[in-house]
């Protein structure tokens, strides 16, 4: 994409103040219109402990062929811009006055007053458009961020995450799943990780299982790859590989949230080191150099979003049943990142968390010789799996938690098997013995034998 249109916009900034005006979307490849967020202080991982990412406030700006201006000049703060699929409307998180909590707002590109979408006692941030006039965003409840969706026109919100970890949506994938960042806990550390969930809250899973790296601020590119920040640099997930792949980009630190132009180049936030401010740069993947677009010595310039139309993601028809609980079928617990001796796994325990955050046992069920088990679990609560040997000793216990929606029926290839693993073409022994799941809903903490 030619940079002359960008430069023309930049030169015109000197003559412009922060006044409201109509925004022009990019009509083609000969111009570049975009939004970005400016903030003195930016902590991209503050959400992990329910804290403020913009401790000194933030402002969303528009840069188009007319110049630059604040998106909503009369707001005390604005951030997290997102463009509708038709390119005609914008979502953003905003505060009308400094003492307000963050709320989700929508404004038309053609002009007019912003419309408040949420009324959250605490903050609602990071909004994104979903198909069928719905949105997804993060809501803070008791100092903890959870992801939920709601109709644009108002109505009852639907929680999508039910674990104890904080979570923040970052993109809506073309297949309809919601990409979000949350915490991954291991025995030694807790790091941000990339996850997906369907728009009804079912099917939650980590995007890749090579955990341990600091990963956040992920977006889907035109190729279908997921572009993310990993330990300050850029990396990607691609369908052909089960592990993260590095992106050979110019040295420095990246803020993520890339914006890809129709020609495949990236508008992104970069800084030379941790003591510098993020500035907007233009980069063609594979090129040796970044090209400056916009910088401010006292502000971080982040969250670039192009003002362009884009395809509507696939709609997700929910497969949830009208059942009071959920069913979980594991085909083979030996299929795992962890190595288990043949015949060593004899039973499985399931835990949730009580009101104080302590683990509470829901029940114990047998594991068959082929590693299969079939259990009915409590829904919309944190769940944690523990595998035991014949003496009741722990072989492996999850450090984190997952969840299942009411009426969800889920089949797992194994225990933390990874997306590259396919199941054996065989009926699991647990179903040959009984199609009745073992009761692990917490009605009792006794051993649950199901149909055995």
Residue ranges and their predicted role:
Residues 8-17:
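Bacterial N-terminal signal peptides
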Residues 1-9:
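Bacterial N-terminal signal peptides that target proteins for export
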Residues 4-5, 22, 447:
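Positively charged, low-complexity intrinsically disordered regions
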């Amino acid at each position: 994409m030619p940079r002359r249109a960008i430069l023309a916009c930049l030169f015109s900034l000197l003559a412009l103040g922060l006044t409201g005006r109509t925004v022009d979307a990019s009509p083609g490849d000969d111009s570049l219109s975009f939004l970005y967020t400016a903030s003195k202080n930016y902590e991209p991982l503050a959400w992990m402990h329910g804290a403020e990412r913009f401790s000194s406030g933030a402002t969303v700006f528009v840069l188009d062929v007319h110049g630059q201006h604040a998106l909503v000049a009369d707001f005390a703060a604005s951030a997290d811009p997102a463009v509708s699929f038709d390119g005609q409307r914008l979502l953003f998180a905003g505060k009308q006055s400094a003492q307000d909590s963050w709320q989700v707002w929508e404004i038309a590109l053609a002009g007019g007053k912003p419309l408040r979408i949420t009324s959250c006692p605490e903050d609602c941030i990071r909004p994104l458009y979903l198909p069928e006039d719905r949105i997804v965003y993060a809501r803070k409840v008791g100092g903890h961020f959870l992801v939920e969706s709601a109709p644009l026109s108002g109505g009852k919100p639907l929680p999508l995450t039910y674990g104890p970890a904080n979570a923040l949506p970052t993109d809506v994938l073309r297949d309809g799943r919601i990409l979000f960042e949350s915490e991954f806990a291991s025995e030694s550390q807790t790091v941000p990780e990339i996850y997906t969930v369907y728009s009804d809250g079912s099917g939650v899973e980590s995007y890749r299982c090579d955990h341990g790296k600091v990963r956040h601020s992920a977006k889907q590119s035109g190729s279908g790859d997921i572009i993310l920040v990993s330990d300050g640099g850029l990396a990607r997930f691609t369908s052909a590989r089960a592990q993260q792949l590095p992106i050979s980009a110019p040295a420095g630190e990246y803020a993520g949230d890339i914006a890809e132009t129709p020609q495949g180049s990236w508008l992104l936030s970069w800084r030379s080191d941790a003591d510098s401010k993020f500035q907007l740069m233009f980069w063609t993947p594979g090129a040796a150099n970044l090209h400056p677009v916009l910088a401010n010595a006292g502000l971080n310039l982040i969250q670039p979003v192009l003002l362009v139309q884009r395809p509507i993601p696939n709609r997700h028809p929910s497969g949830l049943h009208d059942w009071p609980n959920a069913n979980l079928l594991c085909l083979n617990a030996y299929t795992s990142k962890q190595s288990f001796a043949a015949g060593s796994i004899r039973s499985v325990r399931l835990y949730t968390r009580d009101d104080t955050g302590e683990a509470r046992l829901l029940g114990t069920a047998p594991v068959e010789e082929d590693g299969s088990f079939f259990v009915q679990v409590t829904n919309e609560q944190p769940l944690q799996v523990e595998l035991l040997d014949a003496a009741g000793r722990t072989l492996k216990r999850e450090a984190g938690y997952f969840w299942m929606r009411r009426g969800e029926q889920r089949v797992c290839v194994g225990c933390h098997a990874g997306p590259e693993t396919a199941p054996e073409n065989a009926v699991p022994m647990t179903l040959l013995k009984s199609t009745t799941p073992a009761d692990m809903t917490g009605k009792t903490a006794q051993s649950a034998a199901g149909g055995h």
